[in-house]
């Protein structure tokens, strides 16, 4: 997938906002078939006091509100970290076509058969390093 510079910068900015708000620094963008920005989301479980406050779910909710439909056929998700099981289930139900992620999860989920087209993004090494450094710094500060 070819990701334009504006979306890359937005993802970096959003991850930094999450980090500065003491949230796990994950960002998510939803784009249409042409790669145009539709919605964004960051983790906000602590500030929202809501277990559903994952970047992917927040981006999906914003996209649904923007387009006026819960069906997101024809849309793709770009996320800084591979989605968890909960997010995978919501992604599947929302019918998002493709999920592209920069960093793979380090933990194995329980549900490995989710029938979602997930692809780790090739290249973009600077962005991968950026997201990894934010996540590492966040968790190092928690220890």
Put a short name on every predicted segment.
Residues 39-45:
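Short beta->alpha transition motifs characteristic of CBS
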Residues 26-35:
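Short beta-strand scaffold segments in enzyme catalytic cores
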Residues 1-21, 83, 89-143:
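Zinc-dependent deaminase
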Residues 39, 56-65:
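Glycine/small-residue-rich phosphate/adenosyl-binding loop
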Residues 69-81:
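Immediate flanking context of iron-sulfur cluster ligation sites
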Residues 68-69, 113:
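Short secondary-structure boundary/capping segments
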Residues 24, 71-73, 95:
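Short loop/turn motifs at secondary-structure junctions
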Residues 47-57:
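A short, polar/charged loop-to-alpha-helix boundary motif
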């Amino acid at each position: 997938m070819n990701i334009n510079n504006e979306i890359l910068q937005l993802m970096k900015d959003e991850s930094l906002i999450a980090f500065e708000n003491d949230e796990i620094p994950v960002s998510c963008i939803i784009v249409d078939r042409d790669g145009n920005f539709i919605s964004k989301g960051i983790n906000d479980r602590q500030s929202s006091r809501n277990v559903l406050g994952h970047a992917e779910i927040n981006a999906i909710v914003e996209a649904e509100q923007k387009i006026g439909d819960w069906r997101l056929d024809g849309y793709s998700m770009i996320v800084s970290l591979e989605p968890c099981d909960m997010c995978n289930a919501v992604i599947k139900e929302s019918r998002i076509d493709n999920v592209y992620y920069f960093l793979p999860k380090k933990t194995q989920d329980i549900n490995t058969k989710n029938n979602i087209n997930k692809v780790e993004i090739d290249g973009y090494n600077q962005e991968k390093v950026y997201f990894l450094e934010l996540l590492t710094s966040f968790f190092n500060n928690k220890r």
